Amino acid sequence: MFKPKKSRNRRKEPPLAEGRKAVRGNVETTEPLRLGFAVKILGRQNLKSNDSRRWRQNPHLRVSLGYLERIFDYLAANDIRMYRMSSDIAPYITHPDFTQFHGQIEECRDELRALGRRARKGKLRLSFHPSQFIVLNSPDPVLVQKSIADLAAQAEMLDRMELGSEAVVVVHAGGTYGDVDEGCNRWIKTYRTLSPKIRRRLVLENDDSRYSAADVLKIHDATGVPLIFDHQHFLCYNPQGLDLGPTVRKFMGSWPAKVRPKIHFSSPRTELRELKRRDRKTRKSTLVLQPPVWTGHADFCHPFEFITLMRALEGAEFDVMLEAKSKDLALLRLRRDLQRYAPAVAVRFGLPALRHIPDESRTILVEENALEAAAMRSSRNAG
């Protein structure tokens, strides 16, 4: 169980990296761009991201924060300065039937403050990305109010950690319900009812099949909500035919002047998919090979796609959240790929130039073993 270290110095520290510049000596410099990943750790065994026990076992945010403390150790050891926390970090925090869980955030105020202090000290950018069940544009007012309650809880945790405005809660626009324009209007209407604490944290992302980059830009124009550009989603769903470069820069321009924007990057899966098909008469299952679906995320990031994007955005300052299936392993591999194939891009992320081309056979073996171990754990949990 995580116990925060006591400190005699109660002076509040400044928010995390609100500005985009750092001062070293008398010289103003730009902080390196950051690479991040989401939730699960695959590079080290037994690092849980949240307390996933069922309600009868009394799960608690305090247990999740203990896991998060260990994750912070791993991030620091690998010089990773951006991380998306599990949106289930506070179990049942807003569940209407389990009011005994509703006070977890207040109960963990000291632990949250301590972890926030550590994040600020390490310049670690944190965020949440709630599930697809957070729908602000639903015609059902009950679902909208539940979504708002969940957003309020996640915003409160970031506030209790005393993090700056770079720590955000990322959402999608929601369902279309047969009319994209009306869906946008409902989202705008709901946004205007949100508390300032939620608005300060909330950012909106374009998606891969419903709300395009053009759609969320319209929502931004009406609300001022900052936008996250998702590269793979843009490639999969851009019916208006927007150009990539100008669109990304519009998204970045939607952020407040002193808050660094961030984007999402992933590569599409290209391999065949194995699907089980059950015969209705015999009830026997057979494996069927199907072509890939381009909205699916690959295990790793294609380095040359990433390099091309970064060169197209030369001079822009932003952080990149990687949404590859291999999580931290994909981030560490992309770093090495940048150093090898695009040293000028690697420098933007603060990575040193390679003096020689390394033999990667040992590293690849370690990655394969980690992925196999993760697959085995997943299989046991499913069983």
Feature locations, PLM:
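Alpha/beta catalytic barrel-like cores
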Residues: 2-125, 132-148, 152-163, 189-193, ...
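Glycine-rich phosphate-binding "P-loop"
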Residues: 168-183, 288-299
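Long, repeat-rich segments with strong aromatic
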Residues: 217-221, 229-239
